[in-house]
C-alpha cells in the first residue's frame, strides 16, 4: 500500500514537471506562428507541399518558438511575479529553476536548427535561429522594457516563421515571401495593442512602457486604426502586383479585412471600452489564421481547376 502511494506521488510529480516545462513554452502562442509558416509554404509550393517537409518545418518552427518563449519566461520572471495573471507561471512560482529552464531552451534551439538543416535547408534553419535571437535580444532584452515601439519592431520576430516556411520550400526568399512577412509584421501592433488596452494596468504596475500606458488609450486606438488599414491593403498585394495568390484568396482577404476595419473603427470611437478592445483582439487572431488558410486554399490545384472551370462557364454563357 505504501509502495503504491509512493509510486502514485512520483507519477504525479513527473506529470507536474512535464506540465511546467510545457507551460514555459507558452503553447497557445505557437499555433498562430505555425499557420503563417503553412500559408507561406503552400504559396511557395504552388499548393503541392511535400508532407514530410511540412511536418519537419512545423516541428522545427515549434521547437524554435518554444525556445524563444522559454528564454522570455526566464528573463521576465521578475515582472511575471508582480502581475496577478502571470504570478503562477513556472518561473515566478519556483516550479522550474533558471538553470534548468536555460538548458531546456538551448536544447530546443539546437534541436530546431539541426532538424531544419538536415531535412529542409540551412537558410530555413538560420532564419528560425535568427527569430530566437531577435526575440530574445531585441524584443525581450532591449525593446520591451524601454520603448513604446516594442511591439512594432519586435513584431519582426513573429513574422519570421513566414520566411522560414518559404525558405524551406524554395531555398530562397522572393518578394512574395517578404510580403507575407510584412503582412504579419503590420498585423502585430493592432493585435498586441488591443491586448495592451485590456491589461493596461498590469503593464503600468511593472513599468512596461506599452503604448496605452505611456501615451494613453486615444493615441493607441489611432495607431491601431492606421496599422489595420495598412495591413488590409498589404494583404491584397499578393494578388496584384505579385500574382502570388488568386481570386479565392482575394475574396477571403477582402471579406476578412472589411470586418477587421469595422472592429478597429468601433474601437477608434470607443477607446476606453475594454470589451471592444477584447473583441478586436480575439478577432485579430481569427483574422490571421483564416487569412493564412485562404492562402492555402487558393494555392491548391483543385481550387485553380474549379476557378478556371467557372470562368470558362461564364464565357460560354456570355
From Swiss-Prot:
It holds the Pfam family UbiA. Keywords: Cell inner membrane, Cell membrane, Heme biosynthesis, Membrane, Transferase, Transmembrane, Transmembrane helix. It is an enzyme of class 2 (transferase). InterPro entries: Protohaem_IX_farnesylTrfase, UbiA_prenyltransferase, UbiA_prenylTrfase_CS, UbiA_sf. Carbon 2 of the heme B porphyrin ring is defined according to the Fischer nomenclature. HAMAP family: CyoE_CtaB. This is Protoheme IX farnesyltransferase. It comes from Nostoc sp. (strain PCC 7120 / SAG 25.82 / UTEX 2576).
Amino acid at each position: 500500500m505504501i509502495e503504491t502511494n509512493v509510486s502514485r506521488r512520483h507519477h504525479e510529480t513527473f506529470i507536474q514537471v512535464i506540465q511546467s516545462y510545457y507551460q514555459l513554452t507558452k503553447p497557445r502562442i505557437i499555433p498562430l506562428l505555425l499557420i503563417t509558416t503553412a500559408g507561406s509554404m503552400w504559396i511557395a509550393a504552388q499548393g503541392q507541399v511535400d508532407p514530410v517537409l511540412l511536418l519537419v518545418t512545423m516541428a522545427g518552427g515549434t521547437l524554435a518558438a518554444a525556445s524563444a518563449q522559454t528564454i522570455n519566461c526566464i528573463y521576465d520572471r521578475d515582472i511575471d511575479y508582480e502581475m496577478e495573471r502571470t504570478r503562477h507561471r513556472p518561473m515566478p512560482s519556483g516550479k522550474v529553476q533558471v538553470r534548468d529552464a536555460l538548458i531546456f531552451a538551448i536544447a530546443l534551439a539546437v534541436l530546431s536548427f539541426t532538424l531544419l538543416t538536415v531535412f529542409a535547408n540551412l537558410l530555413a534553419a538560420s532564419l528560425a535561429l535568427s527569430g530566437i535571437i531577435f526575440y530574445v535580444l531585441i524584443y525581450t532584452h532591449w525593446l520591451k522594457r524601454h520603448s513604446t515601439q516594442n511591439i512594432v519592431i519586435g513584431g519582426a520576430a513573429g513574422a519570421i516563421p513566414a520566411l522560414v516556411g518559404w525558405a524551406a520550400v524554395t531555398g530562397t526568399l522572393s518578394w512574395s515571401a517578404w510580403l507575407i512577412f510584412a503582412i504579419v509584421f503590420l498585423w502585430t501592433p493592432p493585435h498586441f495593442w488591443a491586448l495592451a488596452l485590456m491589461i493596461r494596468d498590469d503593464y503600468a504596475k511593472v513599468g512596461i512602457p506599452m503604448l496605452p500606458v505611456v501615451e494613453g488609450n486615444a493615441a493607441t486606438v489611432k495607431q491601431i486604426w492606421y496599422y489595420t488599414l495598412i495591413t488590409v491593403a498589404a494583404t491584397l498585394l499578393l494578388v496584384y502586383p505579385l500574382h502570388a495568390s488568386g481570386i479565392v484568396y482575394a475574396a477571403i482577404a477582402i471579406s476578412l479585412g472589411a470586418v477587421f476595419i469595422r472592429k478597429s473603427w468601433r474601437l477608434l470611437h470607443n477607446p476606453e471600452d475594454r470589451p471592444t478592445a477584447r473583441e478586436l483582439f480575439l478577432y485579430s487572431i481569427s483574422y490571421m489564421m483564416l487569412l493564412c488558410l485562404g492562402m492555402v486554399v487558393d494555392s491548391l490545384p483543385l481550387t485553380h481547376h474549379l476557378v478556371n472551370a467557372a470562368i470558362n462557364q461564364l464565357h460560354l454563357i456570355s
